[in-house]
Amino acid sequence: MNYEVKEQMYEGKAKQVFATSDPEIVMVHYKDDATAGDGEKKGTIRDKGIVNNKLSNALMQKLEKEGIPTHYVQEINDRDTFVKKVEIVPLEVIIRNVAAGHFTLRMGVPEGTEFKTPILEFSYKNDDLHDPFINHYYALALGLATQE
């Protein structure tokens, strides 16, 4: 599949989204930018965009193999992927294996502490509210998820 990449539609902390010649397909470009503390701390992590692109694509392809539809269309190169244009759900899923960032402040756990079991967290992606943590009841009540 070959789509002509057009104007930028969106730029966030981790990626840029571009329109293509097909109105149902967009191109996602993964950046090396890194932020912390509600964007107060900014930096660059070499090849972060490559890792994020490759990992995201591997996960989407695995889901597709299991019969779960995704937005994945085609990896273009190390940083860019064509995906179906979708409505973004403002929900962040966080899986922690090691204590880092805000978790250490909230829970009083030393940075680098390895957990006996992974910790699953959800946050409501809203910059004005500083991405508050929510549970599945919030996600259902706010229409961010369904029981299925």
Segments from the language model and where they lie:
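Active-site loop/lid in soluble adenylation, ligation, and acyl-transfer enzymes
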Residues: 2-123
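A structural motif
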Residues: 123-142
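A long amphipathic alpha-helix within ATP-dependent nucleotide-binding catalytic cores
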Residues: 144-148
